[in-house]
A protein has these predicted regions:
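Non-catalytic terminal accessory/regulatory regions of metabolic enzymes
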Residues: 1-162
C-alpha cells in the first residue's frame, strides 16, 4: 500500500521555498502572483499502519513548530486541503529511473526510526501559486523555474477562481 504524505509550512510561517519561488516568478516578469506555498510530498510504499505513518510524520518529516502534515492511504484521507479561491496547484516529481536521493535517505531514516515494512519512498514537490495567473504563465513558470525537463515530470491544475 502507498501512503501519500504532505508536509507544508503553517499559514503564519514564511515558506522559504515559496518565498524564493515567488521571487523567481517575478524575475520572469510574471505579475499577479500574490503568494507561493510549497509542500514536500512523500509516497511511502509499504505495509505500515496509520499510527506508523503519524510517527514518521511527527518524528522525522515535519517540524511541528512551523510545519503541518497530512496523509492519505486506502480508505483514509487526512490530507492537506488545497483550497483557495484563485490558485494553481503544480506538482513536480522525478521521471521514472531518475535517482531520488531524498527518497532514498528518507527510507534509510525510516528504518533507523524503527518502522519496518517500508519498501520505498518517492518524493515530489507541490507548489500552490496563488493569484491571477493564466495557464500560459503557469506553463512558463514550470518550464523556466520549477522543472528540469531531463529529470522531472510535472502536472498542474486550476483550483477555484476564474
Amino acid at each position: 500500500m502507498v501512503w501519500i504524505v504532505e508536509i507544508g509550512y503553517k499559514k503564519d510561517v514564511t515558506d522559504p521555498v515559496g518565498f524564493l519561488t515567488k521571487k523567481e516568478i517575478e524575475d520572469l516578469g510574471i505579475k499577479g502572483v500574490e503568494e507561493v506555498r510549497s509542500l514536500s510530498t512523500y509516497a511511502i510504499d509499504g505495509n505500515i499502519s496509520e499510527e506508523q505513518v503519524k510517527k514518521i510524520c511527527e518524528e522525522l518529516l515535519a517540524d511541528n513548530q512551523i510545519q503541518h502534515y497530512g496523509y492519505r492511504g486506502k480508505n483514509i484521507d487526512k490530507s492537506i486541503k488545497h483550497e483557495h479561491p484563485n490558485a494553481w496547484l503544480i506538482e513536480v516529481g522525478f521521471k521514472p529511473g531518475v535517482m531520488d536521493a531524498v527518497g532514498m535517505s528518507t527510507l534509510n531514516a525510516i528504518e533507523i526510526l524503527g518502522v519496518d515494512g517500508v519498501k520505498g519512498v518517492r518524493t515530489r514537490t507541490k507548489y500552490l501559486i496563488i493569484g491571477d495567473v493564466s495557464e500560459e504563465q503557469v506553463k512558463k513558470i514550470c518550464q523556466r523555474c520549477l522543472v528540469n525537463p531531463l529529470i522531472h515530470n510535472y502536472s498542474y491544475q486550476k483550483i477555484g477562481g476564474k
